[in-house]
UniProtKB/Swiss-Prot annotation:
It comes from Mycobacterium bovis (strain ATCC BAA-935 / AF2122/97). It is found in: Cytoplasm. It is an enzyme of class 1 (oxidoreductase). The active site is at K195. InterPro entries: 6-PGluconate_DH-like_C_sf, 6PGD_dom2, G3P_DH_NAD-dep, G3P_DH_NAD-dep_C, G3P_DH_NAD-dep_N, NAD(P)-bd_dom_sf. Sn-glycerol 3-phosphate binds at K110, G140, K195, D248, S258, R259, N260. It catalyses: sn-glycerol 3-phosphate + NAD(+) = dihydroxyacetone phosphate + NADH + H(+); sn-glycerol 3-phosphate + NADP(+) = dihydroxyacetone phosphate + NADPH + H(+). Transmembrane segments: none annotated. Belongs to the NAD-dependent glycerol-3-phosphate dehydrogenase family. Catalyzes the reduction of the glycolytic intermediate dihydroxyacetone phosphate (DHAP) to sn-glycerol 3-phosphate (G3P), the key precursor for phospholipid synthesis. PANTHER family: GLYCEROL-3-PHOSPHATE DEHYDROGENASE, GLYCEROL-3-PHOSPHATE DEHYDROGENASE [NAD(+)] 2, CHLOROPLASTIC. This is Glycerol-3-phosphate dehydrogenase [NAD(P)+] 2. GO terms for biological process: carbohydrate metabolic process; glycerol-3-phosphate biosynthetic process; glycerol-3-phosphate catabolic process; glycerophospholipid metabolic process; phospholipid biosynthetic process.
Length: 334
């Protein structure tokens, strides 16, 4: 059975990477946190805060930050990859020669790669040559700011190697953060990649002043299309009914702390993609709707909500027009 390193490398000091580094440290681990910018690493080491990405969260002294990837990866048998989905490949190409042989590689990213239509675990295997059993995914209803406040939360650790999954589970079990293992990597990744798109749709509805009935319909019908895509790819439906599916979907669609929902609200209020992006950075769902829709098309899976979000984000359709389009679809059994 694979164990977990006494020092774990978390590659990416954004909100999610920093929050998970804190979880690992609070659970008793020694963590090296890689930041792209040296000033972010220096600030973490000197003040114990990361105000740019996770303001207000005091980071334990067992987290050491660095902007040197070689330093971060040296000797780590477990590497958490906390970079955006669309930059995963480029970062891994730089880091691959530095990765210790046999390391457990853990994706924290939620998305489908544009062009290749690969899930993140597939990108990791493709670039590093790792065995599928070496690759794990962490996903669930995990808003970074709430986790940083030590609010109770649960997540899924998915890996085909049960030993690696259990080792990660133990390393993350901090008292306020409860991990569950699952062998269904595909389902865990599809749930995470698709929920951001549905959260954009929920945000758009809020932005134009619609209420809870609309939000409930979007979440429920959004789940239906996520399950259709997941099962077409071989996912277990139970995974998508659990934390990595329904759980993540509800948190991301309903929380005002959700970046994808907040971005959708701006679009609903009439802001352009460009102006919304300047205010709060373009979110993962904007890119994911393009790659997920292409993936669904390749499997002949119908995803009308994803299609509507894609049209609003990339084809100039207004939110009102998207609603008219969805409500004008042919009626059918649930």
């Amino acid at each position: 059975m694979a164990g977990i390193a006494s020092t774990v490398a978390v590659m990416g000091a954004g909100a999610w990477g920093t929050a998970l580094a804190k979880v690992l440290a609070d659970a008793g681990g020694e963590v090296t946190l890689w930041a792209r910018r040296a000033e972010v690493a220096d600030q973490i080491n000197t003040t114990r805060y990361n105000p740019d990405y996770l303001p207000g969260a005091l980071l334990p002294p067992s987290i050491h930050a660095t902007a040197d990837a070689e330093e971060a990866l040296g000797g780590a048998s477990t590497v958490l990859l906390g970079v955006p989905a669309q930059t995963m490949r480029a970062n891994l190409e730089r880091w691959a020669p530095l990765l210790p042989e046999g390391a457990t590689l853990v994706s924290l990213a939620k998305g489908i790669e544009l062009g290749t239509l690969m899930r993140m675990s597939q990108v990791i295997i493709s670039v590093t040559g790792a065995e599928p059993a070496q690759v794990a995914v962490i996903s669930g209803p995990n808003l970074a700011s709430e986790i940083a406040e030590c609010q109770p939360a649960a997540t899924v650790v998915a890996c085909s190697d049960s030993g690696r999954a259990v080792a990660l589970q133990r390393a993350l079990n901090s008292g306020y953060f409860r991990p569950y293992t699952n062998a269904d990597v595909v389902g865990t990744e599809i749930g995470g990649a698709c929920k951001n798109i549905i959260a954009l749709a929920c945000g758009m509805a809020v932005g134009i002043g619609l209420g809870e009935n609309t939000a409930a319909a979007i979440i429920t019908r959004g789940l239906a299309e996520i399950i259709r895509l997941g099962t077409a790819l071989g996912a277990n439906g139970a995974t998508l009914a659990g934390l990595a599916g329904v759980g993540d979907l509800v948190a991301t669609c309903t929380s005002p702390r959700s970046r994808n929902r907040s971005f959708g609200e701006r679009l609903g209020r009439g802001e352009t993609l460009q102006s919304a992006g300047k205010a709060c950075h373009v979110v993962e769902g904007v890119t994911s709707c393009e790659s997920v829709l292409a993936l669904a098309s390749s499997y002949d899976v119908e995803m009308p909500l994803t299609d509507a979000v894609h049209r609003v984000c990339h084809k100039g359709l207004s939110v009102d027009e998207a609603i008219t389009l969805l409500l004008g679809r042919r009626t059918k059994p649930e």
